[in-house]
Amino acid sequence: MMSVVLIGDSIRLGYQPQVQRLLAGEAEVWGPETNGGHAVNVLMHLHLWAKHRQPDLIHINCGLHDLRTDHFGGGEPLVPLPVYALYVERILRYLRTHTRAAVVWATTTPVIDAAAKAEHARWSDFDRSDADVRAYNGFATAICARLGVPVNDLEAVVRARGPETMQNGDGVHYTEAGSAILAEAVAAAIRAHRPR
């Protein structure tokens, strides 16, 4: 049976159980119990999450934690775009050289600006912007194209349906039904790119 590793943030944690159900009998699907966080954290954990597991396929994303602008950080993204691009390339090259897995990159899902801003205003912690989602995805997909890494465009899946119809009201996270739609797209990408 094919072994699959899912790496990503809380969006991945939301769709992972449904991907496991969709691929039951086809693939053993595993993902870290923890949120993958930003690209630097993902790279720091790839030896545990990917190298030592040696799966057949890795479906991976990071971005929402990279592009967040912390209120205590002067309004700059936690991981600025040029640094994010550097780390995305390092992540993909690491997976290529340290695993035998097929790799699928997933784009970062959209942010509803007003809802996200209202949610985080309660905590005075950080903001996210949909314009940054588009910019960060643009850099990541260009790197994937250059390296020959297929992309599962979850951003496009959500935009086609309408983020407001899938999200739970906080501008970022998904309802169970929304996560089910993402899970279907992830399962389809895994089936399409499974090693032959």
PLM-predicted stretches and their roles:
Residues 22-25, 43-196:
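Alpha-helical cap/lid subdomain in secreted, periplasmic
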Residues 15-27:
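A short, Lys/Arg-enriched amphipathic alpha-helix followed by its capping loop at the start of a domain
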Residues 1-17, 38, 67:
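Catalytic nucleophile-elbow at a beta strand-turn-alpha helix junction centered on a G-D-S/GDSL motif
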Residues 5-8, 31-32, 173:
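Short catalytic-loop micro-motif centered on adjacent basic/acidic residues
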Residues 26-42:
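A short beta-strand-loop structural module common to alpha/beta enzyme folds
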Residues 7-9, 34-38, 81, 128-129:
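Short, flexible loop segments at the rims of nucleotide/cofactor-binding pockets, characterized by
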